[in-house]
A protein has these predicted regions:
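ABC ATP-binding cassette signature C-motif
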Residues: 1-91, 150-327
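Flexible nucleotide-interacting loop at or near the entrance of a catalytic core
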Residues: 84-172
């Protein structure tokens, strides 16, 4: 918020924002959206928040294939337009390939036939004029995120009674109670992320609290914290760090390398120290850990933070398909 205030102060001619919604709560993002919509000058923004892009942006600059292309419209319009263009290009190539095959068969069949030689020559000229459009593979890559629960949930998930949490002497959660049922996928929202993070930490016994938190006896929980710095304080490689969460059957270099490859860590990248990973890489490593643990309850505190749009899409798909409970 302080950095945003600094950038916005003085009404600049051009406002450059790199991931401005990272770390902001819902109310702050909504305020920023309204501010930018009314902002009269130029705004150039990099963001992985597609809802923010849809609401604020009038143009999309698509950087892919090593080139940049400008679209008029918001994120959804760009996505639909680019996907339609790719489908049309593929359809044109498919029709061209079909025509090439047809002409090649005619030339091969009748080129030695005197009565058909002129037609064969004509077809050969037509064949030489047909060109396939080059379809360059996208530079965008999607990780494979698939959460499986080793054990089904029983009849109870979570009961919270009279929960209170203080941070530095200030009450952030005051006497709250709720019950969640097996299979529930629950989003927690609040006035600020201090409250929701305090709740997540209390549920995972990662902070002192007053009150009662009772998990069902059949639950097994995996936690993705907002602040994962403690998880990556060692100098271990990605491969060795992840190995500690693998089962005996999975504790194999071939398996772990393949597993990490699906999470976009290929080749020697698995030997990188976890302490030097970027924010997005750390979240992908944490998600890899959660997949290996196979818990039936996932507790995720702002899991899309630092992830790119491709990883967010893959995470969305993985969470929708997850048969356990989600907080």
């Amino acid at each position: 918020k302080v950095l945003l205030a600094k950038a916005l102060f003085g009404k600049p001619d051009v406002l450059l924002l790199d991931e401005p919604t990272n770390g902001l709560d819902i109310q702050s993002i909504s305020w920023l959206e309204d501010f930018l919509i009314d902002f009269e000058n130029t705004v150039i923004v990099v963001s992985h928040d597609r809802h923010f892009l849809n609401k604020v942006c009038t143009h999309m600059a698509d950087l892919d294939f090593g080139k940049i292309k400008l679209y008029v419209g918001n994120y959804d319009f760009w996505k639909q337009s680019s996907e339609l263009a790719a489908r049309l290009q593929a359809d044109r190539n498919a029709k061209a390939e079909e025509k090439i095959k047809e002409l090649q068969e005619f030339v091969a069949r009748f080129s030695a036939n005197a009565s058909k030689s002129k037609q064969a020559t004509s077809r050969k000229k037509m064949l030489d004029k047909i060109e396939l459009e080059e379809i360059v593979p996208s530079s965008r890559k999607y990780p494979f995120i698939n959460f499986k629960a080793e054990r089904e949930l029983g009849k109870d998930l979570l009961t919270v009674e009279n929960l209170s949490v203080k941070i530095d002497g200030e009450t952030v959660l005051d006497n709250i109670s709720f019950i969640l049922r097996p299979g529930d996928k629950t989003a927690f929202i609040g006035q600020n992320d201090i409250q929701t993070t305090a709740l997540m930490r209390a549920l995972m016994d990662d902070i002192e609290y007053e009150g009662t938190i009772k998990w069902g006896v059949t639950t097994s929980r995996s936690y993705l914290p907002k602040d994962n710095s403690r998880d990556f304080s060692s100098g271990e490689s990605i491969l060795e760090w992840l190995r500690q969460f693998a089962s005996k059957e999975e504790d194999d270099n071939t398996f772990l390398r393949g597993f990490l490859g699906r999470m976009l860590f290929s080749g020697d990248e698995v030997n990188k120290s976890v302490s030097v990973l970027s924010g997005g890489e750390k979240v992908r490593v944490m998600l890899s850990k959660l997949m290996l643990l196979k818990s039936n309850v996932l507790v995720l505190d702002d899991p899309t933070n630092h992830l790119d749009l491709e990883s967010i899409t893959a995470l969305n798909d993985g969470l929708m398909a997850f048969t356990g409970s989600l907080l």
